[in-house]
């Protein structure tokens, strides 16, 4: 955002001064990244991972070639909110991506996320030994032809229960759903 331009230099200096912290930079504005890197950037810093968001195939095909050419040592892809099927094979096969995350649409959004879409990207990540995190189902999740309306409070838990994680962090049997208030969904 252009509103951030006035303090961007200070942020870059802070990132440079703190190699002990990993900075996760995420954007959907692929075309602005190169012009906003500091003059001293070179081929990037070890403590920075650049992540581009891609909600559909069109955006993936627009943004990911840009990210492939940018000088970052660590790169990732965030498919969120994933609103249609996406194929990442041609990008993952380059060996330049370390992590892919997938999430459905939340808050006021009701566009569905299909389990088959998530599984396809998961399989692509496993094929190339790339970390994969299914972050959440979104409000509307479709699996095996059945539609599930999932409150925000349960979306991460349900994603973890799918065991679509690479590497697998939790086994489905180990994930407990904490009791929640039926009205506000807060944990007891």
Predicted feature locations:
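Core AdoMet radical
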Residues: 1-36, 40-85, 97-114
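Auxiliary Fe-S-binding modules of radical SAM enzymes
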Residues: 83, 89-188
């Amino acid at each position: 955002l252009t509103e951030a331009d006035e303090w961007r230099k200070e942020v870059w200096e802070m990132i440079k001064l703190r190699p002990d912290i990993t900075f996760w930079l995420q954007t959907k504005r692929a075309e602005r990244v190169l012009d906003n890197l500091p003059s001293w950037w070179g081929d990037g810093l070890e403590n920075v991972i650049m992540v581009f968001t891609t909600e559909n195939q069109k955006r993936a095909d627009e943004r990911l070639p840009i990210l492939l050419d940018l000088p970052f040592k660590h790169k990732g892809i965030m498919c969120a909110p994933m609103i249609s099927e996406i194929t990442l094979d041609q990008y993952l096969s380059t060996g330049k991506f370390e992590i892919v995350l997938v999430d459905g649409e939340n808050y006021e959004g009701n566009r569905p996320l299909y389990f088959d879409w998530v599984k396809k990207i998961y399989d692509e990540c496993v094929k190339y030994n790339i970390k994969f995190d299914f972050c959440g189902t979104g409000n509307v999740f479709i699996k095996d032809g059945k539609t599930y309306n999932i409150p925000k409070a349960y979306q991460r838990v349900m994603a973890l229960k799918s065991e679509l994680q690479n590497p697998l962090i939790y086994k489905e049997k180990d994930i407990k759903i904490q009791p929640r208030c039926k009205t506000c969904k807060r944990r007891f």
